[in-house]
Amino acid sequence: MEDGVTPPLLITEKDTTMIRVKEEVKKQLWLSAPLIGVSLLQYSLQVISVMFVGHLGSLPLSAASIATSFASVTGFTFLLGTASALETLCGQAYGAKLYGKLGIQMQRAMFVLLILSVPLSIIWANTEQILVLVHQDKSIASVAGSYAKYMIPSLFAYGLLQCINRFLQAQNNVFPVFVCSGITTCLHLLLCWLFVLKTGLGYRGAALAISVSYWFNVILLSCYVKFSPSCSHSWTGFSKEAFQELYDFSKIAFPSAVMVCLELWSFELLVLASGLLPNPVLETSVLSICLNTSLTIWQISVGLGGAASIRVSNELGAGNPQVAKLAVYVIVGIAVAEGIVVVTVLLSIRKILGHAFSSDPKIIAYAASMIPIVACGNFLDGLQCVLSGVARGCGWQKIGACVNLGSYYLVGVPLGLLLGFHFHIGGRGLWLGIVTALSVQVLCLSLVTIFTNWDKEAKKATNRVGSSDDKDGDVQ
């Protein structure tokens, strides 16, 4: 090689790699930004209702908060996890250009979730008796039970909504979901004002507003799917095929539900445990602040995890294992950057954050001391969300469920209880247990991802969605 002559092949390969990385970053951000908005907007519906109830007095506020938490643990979380199976099935089918299968999978998921909603609604109908059974105050249990009953229609709508969301997300069609969520949130504010403050329904009106809003969102998105040209190949109408292969769907859906529930239940469990600590009012108040802060920030991570799932499932379904691998590296990098920003912001506002929730100086000071632990947990939670998204994109729900079981219930929760009660660290000890669980979860999922044979995963995706000769609804 002569002096002064640059090897053109090396430059071309390097430039090509950088171009691919930049393109992948653009795709990830284009997907994740609307998904973050969707997560925040849909999460805000229940928060807005509780805020309106707060103007009615301390008893309705306490009851609505407990009913909302109970509804999340016994209903919404389970349906959310079950619907997440579509991230694997629809995402890989779309990548394989088997567009007709997306509509079939969505109908199948809707059928399963509607069936599951029936026993869950029976649980909600008996909320008062269940709360009394676990020694909640009877007056609070009575109001919470009534609140939960008015939320029962929202349970069925929520399951359908999650199915439609994932059907559209799998097609990279995320902006309509964001727009419909925004319209629904605006309507919800109006409904809460009308039902809670103007019609005399009181706290019941707040619960009813949730039900109406979720159904309104379902109708909006259903109309979009029905009439939009972008869904003309993936939605071809109702089909009897949806009632077939239910067992195959459940093999992914059940572990997917377990994967989500095990994680979210552990947070609620430790907040409940804080009520058994010395000075339970202080501990419970501060842990609730930490939980609400973490849940709000978690919505950002959920959006990133959704983008990871879409990109990985699409590329594996399309038979592009190396592009899927690149997508993983890019989204992890984005999650690290997001985590650094979150930690920086939380630490900078740690002394004033408590004022948003309370005027009690003890609660404010205690919350400030907890923020560094919470910030560490949020950083790790961002990583686990994108790694869990990768797991859903690959169809690793069983692995994810096992990892979450071990991380939270064999390590995190026992350690948190040990630190909180035996070593008398209190709420800090409980939250340190969560941080430890997240650390183990991130480590395990990272190892699984690092040692993945992506060529093999692409073949699995091809087998899962079916032969390319069966491209019903394919568009060339």
UniProtKB/Swiss-Prot annotation:
MF GO annotations: antiporter activity; xenobiotic transmembrane transporter activity
Keywords recorded for this protein, A-Z: Membrane, Transmembrane, Transmembrane helix, Transport
Transmembrane portions of the chain: 29-51, 70-90, 111-131, 140-160, 177-197, 205-225, 252-272, 286-306, 326-346, 363-383, 405-425, 431-451
Gene Ontology CC annotation, any one: membrane
Keyword Chloroplast: no
Bilayer topology term: Multi-pass membrane protein
Keyword field contains Transmembrane: yes
Primary localization class, coarse: membrane
GO-annotated biological processes: xenobiotic detoxification by transmembrane export across the plasma membrane
InterPro entries referenced in this protein's UniProt entry, alphabetically: MATE_euk (IPR045069), MATE_fam (IPR002528)
Localization of this protein: Membrane
Protein origin, superkingdom: Eukaryota
Family as reported in the entry's similarity comment: Belongs to the multi antimicrobial extrusion (MATE) (TC 2.A.66.1) family.
NCBIfam families on file: matE (TIGR00797)
The protein's name: Protein DETOXIFICATION 17
Encoding gene per record: DTX17
